[in-house]
Amino acid sequence: MKKEEVYIVDFKLENEEIIKQYFYKWIESRRHIPKNFTKEIRLMSVRPYYMPCYVCNLKIQLDYTIRVQKRYKIRRGMSTIIDDNEMFYIKDYSLFASQVIPRYDMDQISPYDFSKMHISGDETKDAPKEKFIQVYDDCINHYKGAVMKKLEDVINKKLLKQNTKEMKKKFYKVKSHEIIDEEFYKVLVPVWVCKYSYNMKTYYCIFNGQSGKEFGHTPSRKIDKIFISVVIFLIIMIIAVFYLYI
């Protein structure tokens, strides 16, 4: 079943100055960054956005095969195969559909509390809303691997309950699965985007507008070329001295 309305999850963090504090705290926490990076960056903008997301509830029927190996100290018994079927449910699963922010980046600032969503049009913060350009089917196909990983987790948890500690459990293969019921909603989620520059390049850090959870990109520290040259020179000298005295 499909809900035609566009829902919205409003900002819990609405103060731009608070987001700036979060940003600089995140910068200070970064490791393996260039020397003087924290002093030379320039924060260019801090802006709120509502990003598109499909939130779905899935009911999946699957048949699967599990390989179970008996282990006792050093000795191992023969592998056995368990074939079973399961009804699997996913509730409030996020399928991010933004063309502006990569899906991977949005995944890193999840989850959102979708119990707080309401119909769009009555939001407290005035912020740009990205349109739903990507369709639901494309999003569910993109996330198929992640859904399968959840199936693996469910199956392994079931085995943990059924078998003793002497059993080594391994997810072997999903033979077939079928989504027999699905329900999805169009939801706009709150995001703060911090745009900053360093060494003439632009970088971004995004914050979950509900929880403040962040994810961003920073340049990596490059090993000094002079340092590398000195190390190579010393290695050559050591080898030369070694051969001289042999």
How should these model regions be labeled?
Residues 24, 68-71, 207-209, 218-220, ...:
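Surface-exposed beta-strand edges and their flanking turn/coil or helix-capping segments
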Residues 2-197, 202:
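Charged, low-complexity helical/coil segments in non-catalytic cytosolic or luminal regions
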Residues 74-78, 213-215, 224-226, 234-235:
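Short, low-complexity, polar/charged sequence segments that are solvent-exposed and flexible
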Residues 10, 14, 31, 214, ...:
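Functionally constrained cores in energy, signaling, and assembly domains
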Residues 221-246:
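C-terminal single-pass membrane-anchor helix
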